[in-house]
Design a protein with these regions (language model features):
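Hydrophobic/tyrosine-rich beta-strand signature of extracellular beta-sandwich/beta-rich modules
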Residues: 58, 127, 176-178
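Short beta-strand edge segments in extracellular beta-sheet folds
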Residues: 83, 145, 194-198
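Accessory beta-strand-rich segments of carbohydrate-active enzymes
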Residues: 1-93, 117, 132, 259-262, ...
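Short glycine/proline/serine/threonine-rich loop/turn segments at secondary-structure transition edges
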Residues: 8-9, 49-53, 160-175
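Beta-strand-rich binding/interaction modules
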Residues: 106-145, 152-156
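N-terminal carbohydrate-binding accessory modules
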Residues: 94-96, 176-247, 266
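Surface beta-strand/loop "capping" patches
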Residues: 87-119
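Substrate-binding/catalytic cleft of secreted carbohydrate-active enzymes
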Residues: 236, 242-247, 251-390
Length: 390
C-alpha cells in the first residue's frame, strides 16, 4: 500500500528500458507513450497517487515487425524505480559533472538541475567529493534561492588537487554527494553520483590523447542482450560482458547500436573500458520496415537527451555516436540531420566529441565529405584494405 509522506510528497516513476511503445497508466490515467525501446524515461506520478492501493500498468506493443536488425527482447527488460523526494529536489539526471585540466590542475564543475514545487525557498547546495569507501576529500557549497514552481540550474566550480586520474589501466573513481538543504528546516534531498577525473583530447595528427598520453583503442561492438539470458538486464550479466572484454585485451567498446544498460556502463567505469555511447542504428531511411525511421522526426531530440543526460557522468564514455552506418549519405538528406543531432549533443555536453559510423565499403569516400564535416571524429566503416586478410 502507498503511504503518503508529507516530508517527501513528490513521486517519480523511472523506467530504464521498456521494449517498446511503452504506455504507462497510473490508476487509469494515461501518462503517455515512449516508443524507442532503448531509451530511459520517467513520469511524475504525484498527482495520480492515492493512499492505499494503486494500480500501475504498462502496455507494451512490439507487434510492428521487423523493427530491428538484431534480437531485441520485449517488455520491461531493465530496472524500474520509484523515487520519492521533497518538494524541492534534484531532477532525475539532474547532476552533471565535468572535469578539465587548467594550468596542469584539475577543475571540477557541477551543474545541478533543481525543481521546486512550492513557494520561494532559500537553500544551500552542498557538493562533497569522497573516496568510494566514503572518506571525505573536499566539500563546496553555494547559497541559492529557488523560485516557486520553477526549475533552475546552479553551477559550482572548484579545484580538485591531487586527483587520481581515470584510465583503462588505472580506473580510479570518486563519488559526488550533492545535498540540497533548505534553510527553513524543510527536508533535504540528496543525490550520489560516481565520477572519474580524466582529460580527453583528439586530433588528426596525434589521434586520441588520454591524460596527456596517446592511446590506441583495441575495441569491439557489443549489443545489449545477454546471450541465453535474453535481453533482460542483470547486473552480474552486464559486468560479465565487460569483464570478458577486459580479459580478452580490449580497452574500448561501442554500444551497438543503442544506449546500453546502466550497469554495463558502471562496469566499464570500474574495470577500465573506454566507451563510444551510441544512440541509433539509423535515421529517416529504413533498414527494416518498422525501425527507428518511423520515429526519428518526432522522437530523436528526446531520445538524444535521454542518452546524454543519463550517461554523461560516466568517465568511461569519451565519445557520443549519433548513428551507425546510416542509409543517407549525400546532402541534404544526410547532412542536415547530422548537424542537428551533433549540435544537440554538444549543447547537452560540450565536453565530449561526436562521431558516427560511416560505411562506404572502401568506395567513394569523397561523397561523405559534407556529412563527415558535421562530426568531430569520423568513423570509417570499413577500412578493410588496412587490415590483415583471412
Amino acid at each position: 500500500d502507498f503511504v503518503p509522506d508529507s516530508r517527501r510528497p513528490e513521486t517519480t516513476l523511472y523506467f530504464e528500458g521498456v521494449y517498446m511503445n511503452a504506455e504507462v497508466f497510473v490508476n487509469g490515467h494515461n501518462l503517455g507513450i515512449r516508443p524507442y525501446g532503448y531509451s530511459s524515461f520517467y513520469h511524475d506520478i504525484t498527482p495520480y497517487l492515492k493512499a492505499g492501493k494503486n494500480v500501475i500498468a504498462v502496455r507494451v506493443d512490439n507487434s510492428g515487425q521487423k523493427n530491428c536488425r538484431w534480437y531485441t527482447g520485449s517488455g520491461i527488460y531493465r530496472n524500474v524505480k520509484l523515487i520519492r523526494t521533497p518538494k524541492a529536489h534534484f531532477e532525475p539526471w539532474g547532476i552533471g559533472i565535468t572535469t578539465e585540466q587548467v594550468n596542469r590542475k584539475t577543475q571540477v564543475e557541477v551543474e545541478a538541475t533543481l525543481a521546486n514545487r512550492d513557494k520561494d525557498l532559500p537553500a544551500t547546495l552542498l557538493c562533497t567529493v569522497t573516496e568510494l569507501d566514503g572518506h571525505t576529500i573536499l566539500t563546496q557549497k553555494e547559497t541559492v534561492t529557488l523560485e516557486a514552481n520553477r526549475t533552475s540550474k546552479v553551477k559550482l566550480q572548484f579545484p580538485f588537487e591531487n586527483a587520481k586520474l581515470w584510465s583503462p589501466e588505472t580506473p580510479n573513481l570518486y563519488r559526488m554527494v550533492c545535498c540540497l538543504v533548505p534553510t527553513n528546516g524543510e527536508p533535504a534531498d540528496t543525490v550520489t553520483t560516481t565520477f572519474g577525473v580524466r582529460h580527453v583530447e583528439y586530433s588528426a595528427k596525434k589521434g586520441l590523447i588520454l591524460n596527456g598520453k596517446a592511446i590506441e583503442l583495441n575495441g569491439g561492438c557489443v549489443h545489449h542482450d545477454n546471450g541465453p539470458l535474453g535481453a533482460a538486464s542483470y547486473r552480474d550479466a552486464e559486468w560479465r560482458k565487460a569483464q570478458l572484454m577486459k580479459e580478452a585485451g580490449f580497452n574500448a567498446v561501442r554500444t551497438s547500436h543503442n544506449p546500453p544498460a546502466e550497469a554495463f556502463l558502471d562496469a566499464c567505469d570500474h574495470l577500465g573500458l573506454l566507451v563510444i555511447d551510441e544512440s541509433f542504428d539509423g535515421w529517416r531511411s529504413a533498414k527494416t520496415p518498422k525501425d527507428y525511421s518511423i520515429l526519428f522526426d518526432r522522437w530523436w531530440t528526446k531520445d538524444i537527451e535521454s542518452m546524454v543526460l543519463r550517461d554523461r557522468n560516466h568517465p568511461s564514455i569519451f565519445c557520443w555516436s549519433i548513428g551507425n552506418e546510416i542509409i543517407e549519405r549525400k546532402p541534404p538528406e544526410a547532412v542536415l540531420p547530422a548537424y542537428a543531432l551533433a549540435g544537440h549533443v554538444r549543447r547537452l555536453d560540450p565536453s565530449r566529441p561526436v562521431t558516427s559510423a560511416l560505411a562506404a565499403w572502401d568506395k567513394d569516400w569523397e561523397i561523405y565529405d559534407p556529412l563527415a564535416a558535421a562530426h568531430d571524429i569520423v568513423g570509417y566503416n570499413y577500412m578493410m584494405h588496412k587490415g590483415p586478410s583471412d
